[in-house]
């Protein structure tokens, strides 16, 4: 139900006086426009995009990775964006390629989105952009896992994607970059999924940054039943919100509402060192040791 078309209302003018043809701009001028427009990572981390596009001179970047995986349950905002506005995404990718000086760009999309894979593959034809269909598993959208899945490269322990020649950006970030550079539109809105068991009419919405979450839920038919949990973002990596009066931010990829009966409230039990968390960890760390040391 959350894969419905994006609900729309009047937007910023599609082209403002501050928009420019990226072909007439230098890489630094483009980065300045991205910075001035307030563009950040739209996947949820909200790391400043212009900083990510400025690796040290000794770090040779040869791959631009676009994250269209969206592996968090319930969230389908990036999916809808790829289906409804692929040209905006591709325009942003071409700008990012110019800034980084790379020839290789790959969009990673999970195989459970065949419509997006097909559409983006056709839209990218002849533009130096590839689409990689990835196995459906969590956390496929995490930077290190995504880089390994698409390139076979491993980010060094304690390192960053730039240490293996890659820069990763979300597809929503690419679209925002295109809006900022070509049209002069700052980051004042984004696509977000409003869903969960306690939402009457789950939808994807184009939301204004700063709108109270309650207004978004109201647009989706309101909440039903007693609310047990409100989450900004996905159920795995999102942040709990104290109330629906909290404003949406640039990192609000979703607003999830769950009923009281769906929220697990069991007390924490002792670790019996069964090893299940170690086997499940995609980064091969030892969660048991982390838990033990935090309690010490």
Where do the model's predicted regions map?
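Acidic low-complexity segments
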Residues: 1-42, 47, 58, 114
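Short acidic, glycine/serine/threonine-rich loops at helix termini
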Residues: 11-15, 45, 51-53, 75-79, ...
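Metallocofactor- and cofactor-centric catalytic cores in central/energy metabolism, strongly enriched
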Residues: 38, 45-46, 50-56, 78-83, ...
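Gly-rich Lys/Arg/Thr-decorated short loops/hinges at beta-loop-alpha junctions or inter-strand turns
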Residues: 64-78, 198
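Histidine-anchored nucleotide/phosphate-binding helix
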Residues: 83-99
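Hydrophobic alpha-helical positions that pack around
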Residues: 103-213, 219-224, 234
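A glycine- and small/hydrophobic-rich beta-loop-beta segment
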Residues: 191, 219-222, 229, 238-272
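Ferredoxin-type iron-sulfur electron-transfer modules in oxidoreductases and energy-metabolism complexes
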Residues: 253-268, 276-296
């Amino acid at each position: 139900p959350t894969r419905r078309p994006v609900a729309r209302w009047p937007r910023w003018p599609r082209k403002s006086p501050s928009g420019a043809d990226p072909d007439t701009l230098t890489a630094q001028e483009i980065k300045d426009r991205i910075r001035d427009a307030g563009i950040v990572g739209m996947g949820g981390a909200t790391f400043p995009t212009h900083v990510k596009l400025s690796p040290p001179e000794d770090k040779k970047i040869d791959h631009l990775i676009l994250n269209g995986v969206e592996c968090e349950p319930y969230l389908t905002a990036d999916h809808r964006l790829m289906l409804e506005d692929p040209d905006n995404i591709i325009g942003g990718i071409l700008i990012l390629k110019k800034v980084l000086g790379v020839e290789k760009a790959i969009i990673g999309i999970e195989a459970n989105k065949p419509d997006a894979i097909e559409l983006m593959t056709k839209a990218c034809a002849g533009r130096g952009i590839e689409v990689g269909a990835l196995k459906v598993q969590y956390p496929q959208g995490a930077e290190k896992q995504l880089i390994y899945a698409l390139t076979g490269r491993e980010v060094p322990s304690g390192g960053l994607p730039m240490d293996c020649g890659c820069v990763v950006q979300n597809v929503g970030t690419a679209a925002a970059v295109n809006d900022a550079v070509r049209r002069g539109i700052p980051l004042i809105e984004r696509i977000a999924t409003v869903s969960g068991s306690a939402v009457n009419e789950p939808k994807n919405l184009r939301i204004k940054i700063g709108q109270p979450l309650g207004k978004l839920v109201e647009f989706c038919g309101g909440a039903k039943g007693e609310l047990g949990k409100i989450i900004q973002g996905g159920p795995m990596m999102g942040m709990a919100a104290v109330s629906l009066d909290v404003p949406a931010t640039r990192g609000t990829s979703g607003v999830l509402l769950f009923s009281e009966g769906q929220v697990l409230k069991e007390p924490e039990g002792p670790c019996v060192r069964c090893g299940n968390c170690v086997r499940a960890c995609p980064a091969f760390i030892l969660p048991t040791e982390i838990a033990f040391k935090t309690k010490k």
